[in-house]
Amino acid sequence: MQRCKPFLCALASLVLPLCLCFAPALAKAPLTVTVLDVGQGDSIFVGFPNGQDMLVDAGDQAAGPTVVQYLRSRGVTRIDILVASHPHADHIGGVSRILGVFPVGRVWDSGYVHGSRVQEDFLRTIKAKGIRYGKPKAGFSQQVGEATVQVLAPPAKPLSGTDSDANNSSIVLRITYGAVSFLLPGDMESGERATVAKWPRSTVLKVAHHGSRNGTDLAFAKAVSPEYAVISYATGNPYGHPHRETITALQSAGAKVLGTATDGTVVFTTDGKSISYTTSHTAAATPNAARQATGESTGPAASAATDETYYIGNKHSKVFHRPSCHTLPSAKNQVIFRTRDEAVVQGYRPCKNCNP
């Protein structure tokens, strides 16, 4: 075997360290967080740098196919963590479709017992498939590669007697990757918000409860101080979301406000240092969610979103509901109506709870 000549060996020992010092650093794999446009509901997809995937909620039942299509477009074949922030139909109604298409590693659930058919079907399916099931509370933390997922709420002792105990039992997540963080509070209202002594600053805030005034106040907005705030809602929804007070609070805290009804699906990408985003609709100079909340016209996107309105009928009781109603029938007992008149003509009467 030939040995290295002394001169060449000495030269190599000098040059190699210099090459290593000046070699460009390998780019870190990105973390992506997608707030999907699912109408008046929530669904957030998280693609971790290590290749694992998390889905937080899946919108209402009609949104299920939309979520499935998006996940397939991203090449998802398995969901490692499926989070049901709380049991309302506009957050977990689409989960049944997800469970029927993708294998799921584990489910995180708020643990709040709502008693609706939607929740019963959800829990029954998890049990039948033998999926690992947990109810993480404040203080729980999970490392996913180089990213960290923290649970900030709900507290170990459930809240009761609030305006909405279900909303105030939402799993509140904070996902951190390097210097960039995302706060996902479900439908948290003021009761649950008060259980967190100090809210951490976060780069991106998925606004609580579709922009309702009970989900965000000025003190909370300033504490979190997000660069971006995304509101998931449908144009023309019966609740008036997002409320003007919420938009004002977010803007006062310096956030750029985006909305799924007008900006479409919003995708954030970060390497842990910088962050960028894209939307499925052309962004306007003034954030569209803010324009709608102040009564300004939002153009064609606003009228297009109203086409997503539909109603769900109960085949047995002949009662029809809004998709977000808490008393929806089981999936096998549902019939979909595109308009209210269609339901009435077919002999269905409106639900007294949701007043469709």
Predicted regions, residues:
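Compact, charge-rich alpha-helical regulatory domains located at protein termini
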Residues: H326, S330-P356
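Residue-level recognition of short loop/turn positions
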Residues: N50, H316-S317, E342
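Non-globular, low-confidence helical/coil segments that flank catalytic cores
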Residues: Q2-R3, F7, F22-A305, T327, ...
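Immediate flanking context of iron-sulfur cluster ligation sites
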Residues: D307, N314, A343
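Residue-level signal for mature regions of secreted extracellular proteins and peptides
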Residues: A12-L14, K318, V344-G347
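Bacterial N-terminal signal peptides
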Residues: A10-C21
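Short aromatic-glycine-(Arg/Gly/Cys) micro-motifs in beta-strand/loop hairpins
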Residues: Y311-S330
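A broad, structural micro-motif
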Residues: R117, F320, F337-R338
